[in-house]
């Protein structure tokens, strides 16, 4: 499961000094918290595992979401102080700031407002927004954040690194390229969620030049006005009709009605 990989559990009994064990355990608890944030957000009540199961325990019952959230938050309050802060943690590892951000997300998603405020107060002011060049081209700044050369930029709270150089690790395309293509497709809902440059959603902004009528946008006749006057981050996130890749015009040849593609599946340096 991509929501709860077992690899976060099975390494818990490696012999090591007590302080190092505490540090690694704290990082693992933060990662487990992130997984349970995802699991409870999608499925609500799920089995809550805090120890290796025997064969007889394999069919674990569900635990109520509220109980999981309370337990996860208490774990984080106890263990986060044992995690190194940004600047002292090794590159690609959990940091206190990232763990507090995870804690804040869980609390926020579950209406635990005081816990969310307390968690985010440990993050605000500890990191800064990414800026490249002279800072005037915000579209380029946003896209540059996701390039390999900036993978340790100050804006990145939790950086996932590959051990490498394994086959396919870190590459934009997998070792095979075939269906289903929906994994790289950006939906029209995602496109339409980006506001116009006046800060208003497309159904309220006078700057929106597209059509809001159902069926107005198709693969054969894309609504090109839909992409004008929009938040620059849209073109830093999605490959849209009219954009260029490696000197070639993208003509929305994906077998999908949205005609948009998630940007990360194109070679970043070429877009």
Model-derived regions: residue spans:
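Contiguous mid-protein beta-loop-alpha structural module that forms a pocket-lining wall or clamp
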Residues: 93
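Active-site beta-strand/loop architecture of penicillin-binding DD-peptidases
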Residues: 249-271
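Short coil/turn linking the two alpha-helices of tandem helical-hairpin repeats
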Residues: 40-42, 47, 87-88, 106-112
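Short linear capping/connector segments at secondary-structure termini
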Residues: 50-57
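Outer-membrane beta-barrel and related beta-rich outer-membrane complex signature
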Residues: 45-49, 134-135
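Conserved, well-structured interaction surfaces
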Residues: 1, 7-43, 57-70, 75-89, ...
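An aromatic- and glycine-enriched ligand-binding surface/loop that stacks and positions planar moieties
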Residues: 77, 83, 96-255
């Amino acid at each position: 499961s991509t929501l709860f990989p077992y690899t976060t559990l099975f390494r818990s009994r490696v012999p090591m000094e007590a302080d190092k064990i505490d540090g690694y355990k704290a990082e693992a608890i933060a990662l487990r918290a992130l997984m349970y944030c995802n699991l409870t957000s999608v499925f609500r009540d799920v089995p809550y595992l805090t120890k290796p199961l025997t064969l007889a325990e394999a069919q674990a019952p569900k635990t109520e979401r509220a109980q999981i959230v309370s337990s996860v938050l208490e774990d984080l309050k106890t263990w986060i102080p044992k995690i190194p802060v940004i600047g002292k943690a090794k590159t690609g590892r959990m940091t206190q700031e990232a763990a507090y951000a995870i804690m804040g997300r869980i609390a926020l998603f579950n209406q635990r407002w005081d816990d969310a405020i307390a968690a985010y107060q440990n993050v605000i002011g500890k990191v800064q927004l990414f800026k490249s060049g002279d800072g005037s081209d915000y579209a380029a700044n946003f896209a540059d954040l996701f390039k390999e050369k900036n993978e340790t930029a100050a804006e990145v709270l939790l950086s996932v690194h590959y051990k490498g150089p394994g086959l396919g690790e870190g590459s934009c395309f997998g070792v095979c390229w075939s269906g289903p293509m929906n994994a790289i497709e950006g939906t029209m809902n995602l496109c339409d969620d980006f506001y116009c440059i006046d800060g208003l959603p497309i159904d309220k902004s006078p700057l929106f030049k597209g059509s809001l009528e159902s069926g107005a946008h198709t693969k054969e006749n894309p609504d090109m006005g839909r992409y004008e006057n929009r938040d620059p981050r849209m073109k830093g996130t999605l490959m849209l009709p009219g954009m260029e890749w490696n000197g070639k015009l993208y003509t929305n040849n994906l077998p999908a009605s949205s005609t948009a593609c998630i940007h990360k599946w194109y070679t970043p340096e070429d877009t």
